[in-house]
From Swiss-Prot:
Recorded GO CC terms: ATP-binding cassette (ABC) transporter complex
Subunit structure: The complex is composed of two ATP-binding proteins (PotA), two transmembrane proteins (PotB and PotC) and a solute-binding protein (PotD).
Protein name: Spermidine/putrescine import ATP-binding protein PotA
GO MF annotation terms: ABC-type putrescine transporter activity; ATP binding; ATP hydrolysis activity
Amino acid sequence: MGQSKKLNKQPRSLSPLVLLSGISKSFDGKEVISQLDLTINNGEFLTLLGPSGCGKTTVLRLIAGLETVDAGHIMLDNQDITHVPAENRYVNTVFQSYALFPHMTVFENVAFGLRMQKTPAAEIAPRVTDALRMVQLEEFAQRKPHQLSGGQQQRVAIARAVVNKPRLLLLDESLSALDYKLRKQMQNELKALQRKLGITFVFVTHDQEEALTMSDRIVVMRNGVIEQDGTPREIYEEPKNLFVAGFIGEINRFDATVIERLDEQRVRASVEGRECNIYVNFAVEPGQKLNVLLRPEDLRVEEINDDNHIEGLIGYVRERNYKGMTLESVVELENGKMVMVSEFFNEDDPDFDHSLDQKMAISWVESWEVVLADEEHK
């Protein structure tokens, strides 16, 4: 997070494939999407991320043509598809349930869409075989869905979707039914498949780690509007507001009060009662309240014993959890605020594993913090 860790941002040269302009949608008088604008580029893996009820699945269904918009327009490849039926949109959807036909073999499931499109019979077998080969299920072609694992069923659903060569593939929480290990494996396979096919993927999930792992771009939604749109690293390291900061991973929020501006970048502030310099890229006034945000892994901790004096926020270890590569500690500051700290394991450091109630000093590298205006005192 913060100034010194920012990426060199590469210009996005991808051409737009889907344009959503001024999209609104209500159900039973309640607006679930409000004046939404979104561009989806050719060949990218875009994730719509947000809590349940934020409108992300509704956006997916509107693009697919499974719901109709109340206002606004949807363009696909420079064609207005706002009122085009779903079957004519060159868009395929993979649902959470996979929706495979239980009485059909894997081959017949994948071939179904081609037959519905009246594809010449001579083309069907090679195209289905190619699609199954891409998802490594060629030898399972004659099995029924109930004879497959959850991960294999998911790959059949993807093969059935890509065999039609859609311009756009929509995936609605399609990994959520898998166990943890298989889910991690499928995340890698899905991203590799997307790169191989060159098809634009739009993926819906509420799982932040999944979004960070798979996406070229993440759109964070809340209450039917977009809170932030950016690369995974931008979303994680440069959150635009407290909602995004808190929704993506663990984060610590410290209360700060401006003392004075030192220069164009730095402000002298009291952070939880400790004076320090913070990087602030917007106008502030003395006495103004701010939020200073730091990820657990961006904090430094040092044990305080009777014979040493260390600068920092003073607190006491209340919980400690060994996670293999990291040690995660909960430190209670002297004012009662709880702070999460994550340290990478170092077997050569005799002070690495802290005792409960150990007195600690918490600090961070200047400029690694993200500073936001206090939304309650605007």
